[in-house]
Amino acid sequence: MPGAFTKTCSALHLPGYIKNYELAIKKGISKIVCVAVNDPNVMKAWGENQNAGSKIFMAGDPFLKFTKAIGAEVDKSEKGLGIRSNRYTMLVENGEVKKVEEEKETATCELSSAESFLKSI
């Protein structure tokens, strides 16, 4: 996700996966990981703020190592956010990427929303 505590991430994207956790498990998903370009302490606080509990593993990517490795970095400097991750949802099975839904804009959460993604798998 683009960033902890940001508008779309906090209002739609992360809450959607928390709300649909049971459906994800029923569809065979064993772990939901939320990755954002923030440090681990911010991710922990955001998870607590969103009541993610043990449903979502909150993973910080402060140096963009993962984000750059998958080619998801996007420059949001004009909004004062610097380099961030694009908004996407990825299905990984046994270390292999099976499906990716990536938004054209970080403010959009349609293809990558829990509801849309879970319907598509």
Model-derived features: positions:
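Chalcogenol-based redox active-site neighborhoods
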Residues: 1-121
